[in-house]
Regions:
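A structural motif corresponding to the C-terminal lobe/cap of the Radical SAM core domain
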Residues: 8-18, 26, 46-51, 55, ...
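Flexible loop/turn segments at secondary-structure boundaries
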Residues: 18-21, 50-51, 221-225, 251-253, ...
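Glycine-rich beta-alpha loop elements in corrinoid/cobalamin-binding modules
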Residues: 9, 17-20, 25-59, 70, ...
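Non-catalytic positions within long, well-ordered alpha-helices that form the structural scaffold/packing
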Residues: 207, 261-262, 396-397, 451, ...
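Radical SAM [4Fe-4S] cluster-binding motif and immediate context
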Residues: 324-492
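Radical SAM enzyme core and accessory elements
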Residues: 2-15, 35-36, 50-168, 187, ...
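N-terminal [4Fe-4S]-dependent radical SAM core
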Residues: 183-186, 306-355, 666-668, 728-730
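Generic beta-strand/beta-sheet core signal
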Residues: 13, 44, 217, 244-246, ...
Length: 730
């Protein structure tokens, strides 16, 4: 064991590829935590750096030269692109600069469609004026520039490297890799074209930083191969450096690891939250902790994979994890792209979002398809709103960016409410979106509060859009509830994305078709803006995987492999042939998101006979019909987000309350005594440093003022107008 009096220097790596528009947050989270311990760390997004090298003038010159010198036979599209190579080489640097938001005037020539070379991706371009409007020049140009990059990506996949993808690399090798054999074979093959760029970039960083420990995060199967390539290079060329591996892939797939060959590429593999395992590992490298006393860490001892968990140190509480630190990452070099012309869908690829977690784990933690037995779901721990907003302020100061994506499994409504109040209380400008459950806590008023604090969008699981299956999933919601909550968000001006699932055990063809009809009606009624269908995947750590008999399925690969063990093959004898529906579901939704085909028969999306839907044509419309509101609960919070009113003219026992709203001057005619009471009371209800009132107090103050029957007042026109202006019960 190396003995040293100083802390080892850490180098965090995100390997290719994750997102083009914003950093994956794992390394920033861990760097922020190490800051609290005074430990030096450096981080790099090697995926971004490889992309920027590849998509540059020199990068394309080298790429086209490589293609011309190879014996690979190109398809017709590739041959066209080769003929247009000078146009690609000439335009690539200006386009990348435009996607960095540094060359905005280029939008005008891109949008005219006579500047960029066009290959097969542009065949999908239809009515861009309809999609972006006559004034949406920059967005239209960003979409066209994205298609241009995707054309080049297609050429790379066809002619150079079939593993390439903008947000993943060699993903197939990481999926369901119960055996390490194929991945090991690929890692011992000569470096690919992309590998060459990767290791060149990695080597420069290693020589620059001279770390003692390289910690590689692999959140997804599409990062695994590159992560191990990085480890392989380091261990071969810099054997004095230790390599640790962790992240989402290890947490879900490698919990029963027995494969010693993986330790040719890394020295340590850690599971679950990384803070304490990392600190313990650094103590070990420093010589102050025995190997056996590491936390949730695999290593290879005498040729045998050994799980080390002798540490008595607890996991770090959320209040102590520190502030995510994006230092070292070139935040101005990320590429904002628009893959499809949909305002909600673009959030995943357009804009630089600071990532932050409101609460660790999932407060619901019951969904039967989910890995609820694993720490990242089951160990729920919230942070306080003031501390979260302290972190928001610090990250805005650090990055110069006020856009946030709260990356919770499902953000808790009560905490969202408190964070929104704290943002408003501090008078901050924040733009944010997050993942939610469509639960009844999201009332109209709460959604209005969220939008006032800067919320622009939410994403959540509708999953199977069938009440029987939602109950089987233990989702805790119904289709009607999802529709109502989505409507509340939409009425407030918040975009809604739904995660959709097909192929859950026992799902019939009829239920699949009915789910599609529900989705069609949600889009048609304007309460769902985008969605994504994925086929149910059985995992070993989910309730379904742990108890398959209860869901009438048969596991086909029950014996665990030596490497990855999470995805399970299964047979669903009582369900339909789920794979048959895949193309039709995805094709219909893609069109619905563009406002196309909403009046087409469902049968038209499929090339085989499907059952007629049993969902009434007005099913969602009926659910969304207005209904009488209940009197608020006594302990509900009540706040005023509008301006403090002033008293205008008074005559004949009536007075005019005047308020300057953002766009309008509003006058409210009320009884004189009520007007005086409202001026004082609304000021006290305003979100500020004082305590927040509850509804019971509001009612008592009204009664104390002797203003008449409260129910009549609350259900009357005055309160109706005040609620539209910002009197919210939350």
């Amino acid at each position: 064991m190396r003995m040293s009096t100083k802390d080892p220097k850490v180098f965090f790596i995100t390997p290719p590829f994750t997102q083009l528009n914003t950093p994956y947050p794992a390394t920033a989270y861990l760097k922020g935590f190490l800051n609290t311990k005074g430990i030096a760390a450096y981080q790099a997004d090697l995926g971004l750096e490889v992309i920027l090298q590849l998509f540059s003038t020199n990068g394309l010159k080298n790429l086209f030269a490589h293609i011309e010198n190879s014996s690979k036979k190109l398809n017709e599209n590739g041959q066209r692109m080769l003929r247009l190579k000078q146009s690609y080489i000439r335009t690539i640097d200006p386009v990348i600069s435009f996607l960095h938001d540094k060359n905005p005037t280029l939008a005008h020539v891109i949008a005219e469609q006579n500047y960029l070379p066009e290959a097969s991706r542009f065949q999908q371009v239809s009515d861009l004026e309809w999609a972006f409007g006559s004034m949406g020049v920059r967005d239209k140009a960003r979409h066209l520039a994205t298609l241009y990059l995707e054309d080049i990506s297609d050429l790379i996949i066809d002619a150079v490297d079939p593993h390439f993808g903008f947000s993943r690399y060699a993903e197939r090798l990481g999926r369901s890799a119960s055996s390490f054999q194929e991945l090991n074979r690929a890692l011992h093959a000569p470096l690919t074209y992309i590998d060459e760029l990767l290791v060149k970039t990695l080597e420069a960083k290693i020589l620059q930083e001279k770390p003692d420990l390289v910690a590689i995060t692999a959140p997804f199967p599409g990062n695994l191969y590159s992560a191990l390539r990085c480890g392989q290079w380091i261990k071969k060329h810099h054997p004095e450096i230790k390599v640790a591996f962790g992240g989402g892939y290890a947490n879900t797939e490698l919990r029963s690891l027995q494969e010693p060959r993986v330790f040719e590429f890394v020295d340590f593999i850690t599971l679950d939250d990384g803070e304490t395992p990392l600190i313990n590992l650094l103590e070990h490298l420093k010589g102050t902790r025995e190997l056996k006393d590491l936390k949730r860490t695999f290593c290879c001892i005498d040729g045998t994979v050994t799980y080390l968990n002798g540490s008595k140190d607890p996991d770090v509480k959320q209040k102590d994890v520190g502030i995510p630190d994006y230092t070292d990452l070139p935040l101005d070099k990320y590429l904002s792209v628009i893959e499809i012309a949909n305002p909600m869908h673009r959030l995943w690829s357009d804009g630089r979002w600071n990532k932050l977690t409101l609460a660790h784990g999932c407060y619901w933690g019951k969904c039967t398809f989910c890995d609820i037995s694993l720490s990242y779901i089951k160990d729920y721990e919230a942070t306080t709103a003031p501390m979260l907003v302290d972190r928001i302020e610090a990250m805005i100061a650090q990055t110069g960016n006020n856009g946030f994506h709260f990356v919770d499994e499902a953000a808790p409504p009560a905490l969202m409410r408190d964070v929104a109040l704290e943002i408003i209380r501090r008078d901050l400008t924040v733009v944010w979106w997050t993942n939610i459950r469509f639960e009844k806590s999201f009332t109209k008023d709460l959604c209005q509060l969220l939008v006032r604090s800067g919320c622009i969008a939410v994403s959540g699981g509708l999953e199977v859009a069938s009440d029987r299956l939602l109950e089987l999933i233990d989702k805790g919601v119904t289709v009607a509830q999802v529709a109502e909550v989505a409507d509340h968000f939409t009425q407030a001006g918040i975009l809604v994305h739904a995660y959709l699932m097909y192929g859950f055990p026992t799902q019939t063809a009829q239920e699949t078709v009915d789910s599609l009809e529900v989705v069609r009606q949600l889009v048609e009624n304007g309460v769902m803006h985008s969605g994504f269908w994925h086929q149910f995947a059985l995992t070993a750590h989910s309730p379904v995987g742990l108890n398959p008999d209860a869901y009438q399925i048969q596991i086909l690969n029950p014996e665990p492999g030596s490497f990855a063990n999470n995805d399970l093959e299964h047979a669903d004898p009582t369900g339909t042939d789920h794979a048959l529906f895949s193309e039709g579901l995805k094709k219909s939704l893609f069109n619905y998101m563009h406002g196309i085909g909403l009046d087409m028969p469902l049968q038209d999306w499929f090339d085989f006979k499907i059952p007629r839907t049993q969902i009434p044509k007005n099913y969602i419309k009926r659910i969304l019909a207005p209904s009488a509101e209940q009197m608020p609960k006594p302990n509900a919070k009540i706040v005023w987000l509008g301006p403090v009113p002033t008293i205008g003219k008074s005559s004949r026992g009536k007075t005019i309350l005047q308020m300057s709203m953002g766009r309008d001057e509003v006058e409210l005619l009320v009884p004189e005594k009520l007007g005086s009471w409202l001026v004082v009371t609304l000021d006290q209800l305003a979100v500020g440093p004082g305590k927040t009132w509850i509804f019971e107090e509001f009612e008592k103050e009204y009664a104390k003022a002797g203003l008449g029957e409260f129910a009549v007042f609350w259900e009357g026109a005055t309160v109706e107008e005040l609620r539209e202006m910002g009197l919210l019960v939350i």
